[in-house]
């Protein structure tokens, strides 16, 4: 699948080495974009950049560090020209109810999922407003809309990402910047994160099939989502096709929030 839906775009994708971030990078390049893969997983990031060829660049990025965000933007712009698109995809999930999860784990989750998205938006707006505008896509979650008792920290972080998206979108519109900011909310997508839960379930005595069925069963469509399906939604929000959409929420959840 290839085309020109992202022709002329330069996109920085945090968490770009795996999962939805990697799937989005592949779709973007297939549609004509140049991509900067920001991640702490150097081996995976470099391998993906090599696979994507001259249209991709890997940069080491800890989303909790503002100077690393600025360095990633600078490296990308030096290689490909002005940034037009930012995808805040880096994330972590540590399961636990309010009685089980500790403050250190809670703060770690928020530091990556919320602080990282905040810094991405902050640095991204500064980069995009000086050019011809562009698009920012944040990755939320169904659990940031509905909550999940065993995902206390993750739900809190993603609920905050949803509201952060709206605040940044309104600011950009009110300031006259041609920058759209939207949020994509995935359900259970079959990525490395879900595979981590599968491994934990197996270690606890469950079968692989039972764990996957457990995740799939919460969706009315009774299956896990594919990374490519989530990436297609990110592509739409990042492309000019969504030119009159800002501050919005797009769900890819098999009917979970219906």
Segments from the language model and where they lie:
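Residue(s) in the substrate-gating loop at a strand-loop-helix junction
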Residues: 141
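Alpha-helical segment proximal to the catalytic Tyr-Lys
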Residues: 126, 170-174, 243
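Canonical Rossmann dinucleotide-binding motif of NAD(H)/NADP(H)-dependent dehydrogenases/reductases
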Residues: 5-36
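Short, small/polar-rich loop/turn modules that mediate ligand/substrate recognition or access, typified
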Residues: 173-180, 245-247
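Active-site helix of classical SDR
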Residues: 121, 157, 165
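Substrate-binding pocket helix/loop in short-chain dehydrogenase/reductase
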Residues: 97-98, 102-110, 215
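C-terminal substrate-recognition "lid" of short-chain dehydrogenase/reductases
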Residues: 80, 118, 223-252, 257
């Amino acid at each position: 699948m290839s085309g020109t839906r992202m022709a002329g775009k330069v996109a920085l994708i945090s968490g770009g080495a795996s999962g939805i971030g990697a799937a989005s990078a592949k779709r973007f390049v297939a549609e004509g974009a140049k991509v900067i893969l920001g991640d702490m997983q150097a081996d995976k990031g470099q391998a993906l950049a090599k696979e994507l060829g001259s249209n991709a660049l890997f940069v080491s990025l800890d989303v909790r560090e503002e100077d690393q965000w600025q360095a990633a933007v600078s490296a990308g712009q030096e290689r490909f020209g002005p940034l037009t698109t930012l995808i805040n995809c880096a994330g972590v999930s540590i399961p636990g109810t309010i009685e089980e999860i500790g403050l250190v784990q809670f703060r770690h989750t928020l530091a990556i999922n919320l602080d990282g998205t905040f810094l991405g938006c902050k640095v991204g707006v500064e980069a995009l407003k000086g050019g011809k505008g562009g698009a920012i896509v944040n990755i939320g979650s169904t659990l940031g809309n509905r909550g999940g008792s065993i995902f206390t920290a993750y739900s809190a972080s993603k609920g905050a990402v949803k509201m952060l998206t709206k605040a940044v979108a309104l600011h950009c519109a009110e300031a006259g910047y041609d920058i759209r900011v939207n949020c994509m909310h995935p359900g259970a997508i079959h990525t490395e994160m879900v595979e981590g839960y599968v491994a934990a379930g197996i270690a606890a005595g469950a079968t692989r099939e039972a764990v996957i069925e457990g995740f799939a069963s919460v969706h009315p469509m009774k299956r896990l989502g594919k990374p490519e399906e989530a990436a297609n939604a990110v592509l739409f929000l990042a492309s000019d096709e969504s030119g009159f959409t800002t501050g919005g929420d797009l769900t890819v959840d098999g009917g979970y929030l219906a």
